[in-house]
Amino acid sequence: MEGAGGKPTAVVAVVTEPRFTQRYREYLEKHKLLDRQHRVKKLRDGTVALPVLREALLEQHLRELRNRVAPGSTCVPTQLLDPVPSKKAQSYSPAQRLCLEVSRWVEGRGVTWSAKLEADLPRSWQRHGDLLLLSEDCFQAKQWRHLEPELWETVASALGAQRLAKRGRVSPDSTRTPAVSLLLGDHGWVEHVDNGIRYKFDVTQCMFSFGNITEKLRVASLPCVGEVLVDLYAGIGYFTLPFLVHAEAAFVHACEWNPHAVVALRNNLELNGVADRCQIHFGDNRKLKLSNVADRVNLGLIPSSEEGWPIACRVLKQDAGGILHIHQNVESFPGKTLQPPGSSEMEEHWPSPHQIISNQLNNGATSDSRRKTLSVATKPEWQRWAKAAETRIATLLHQVHGKRWKTQILHIQPVKSYAPHVDHIVLDLECRPCHLVG
């Protein structure tokens, strides 16, 4: 996401201890991974965040930093909100150029330029290759309508794009279809590369979350060799693909009911050479016929995936159990009473990338995330929600399988922040039949 002046509202960074900063910087510069548009930032816990180029960063780079470049270092991908531009970047402002070129063009059409029109120019946008996706809160004044469609050619030229689209509100339907209109160009298909994985999709039909990059990197490092995974909310393959390509899951059952996302998912599986290890289940996952197949289940739906919990319990292997990766938006307002899972007010929301969180076993978190070299940022609200979810899942497992199961919280991972006091987290929950754990 780019903001006014071309400054992203968040960038990906690699966090380590100060004594390893120079070694990290030299490695990142050598491999053309260092983001020179933003400053290195010292975090509150004393660690240092080095901004990196999101599309170029691979999981193998993180392994090299940990194991070869700086053995013993803590290497954690995270996001920096409102990063500080470097001195070089501060002299370059796409927003200023946009204002200058649009105002000149508007006045050349005989329309008076005003402070109202200037305030109505876009303050943020997403760049998808040659397509620029504008935010919904721009170009709302009536005067713009009389200047279309030539206006969009001027905007695209000023911002270095060939196609333009404008975001609306996400449809409240269950498929979360984005209300995006194409302003300039013949189609909305774009391609992104994250951690070496190619994602193609139509921005007018499918959503793409830039903020999930740290979770995609974490998923890519999970030990899934030989495992079967069920992804209950696959979308265009946000997590299905990292599980297949990097975590080396043996097979993935991908569930999705948005037909446009299914088209993109099928294409992305082919693009990345893993179509033979994935079966797409198109439709409502509550009608899924699978059971007793999964070593892991990914529940990547926010604000809550609770409707999918009974299905997740059913598809876990009856005799061996497995791991659930449960996404949730959790409110952390001071003094607010947390609603337990199963209540009518379960819909929660949330924000920012801290680092690590709790884990009590090895499974479900990388070795670096188990170290205490970075400050533990677990909020009490996250812990309370996780404990309530653990209890609820244990009850569901008993109901589904007719026998007692033991559940244990392995890890709580922050993904991103939406607003103050609203946190998107992932709970890694181990679920085993009691006869396996004594």
From Swiss-Prot:
GO cellular component: cytoplasm
First-level EC class: transferase
The UniProt record lists the keyword Translocase: no
Top-rank lineage group of the source organism: Eukaryota
Catalysed conversion reaction: 4-demethylwyosine(37) in tRNA(Phe) + S-adenosyl-L-methionine = 4-demethyl-7-[(3S)-3-amino-3-carboxypropyl]wyosine(37) in tRNA(Phe) + S-methyl-5'-thioadenosine + H(+)
GO biological process, one term: wybutosine biosynthetic process
Protein keywords: S-adenosyl-L-methionine, Transferase, tRNA processing
CDD domains assigned to the protein according to its UniProt record, in alphabetical order: AdoMet_MTases
SUPFAM superfamilies, A to Z: S-adenosyl-L-methionine-dependent methyltransferases
Metabolic or biological pathway, per its Swiss-Prot or TrEMBL entry: tRNA modification; wybutosine-tRNA(Phe) biosynthesis
Positions bound to S-adenosyl-L-methionine: 209, 216, 256, 284-285
Example of a GO MF term: tRNA 4-demethylwyosine alpha-amino-alpha-carboxypropyltransferase activity
Enzyme Commission numbers on file: 2.5.1.114
Function: S-adenosyl-L-methionine-dependent transferase that acts as a component of the wybutosine biosynthesis pathway. Wybutosine is a hyper modified guanosine with a tricyclic base found at the 3'-position adjacent to the anticodon of eukaryotic phenylalanine tRNA.
Family that this chain belongs to: Belongs to the class I-like SAM-binding methyltransferase superfamily. TRM5/TYW2 family.
Name under which the protein is recorded: tRNA wybutosine-synthesizing protein 2 homolog
Naturally occurring in which organism (per UniProt): Bos taurus (Bovine)
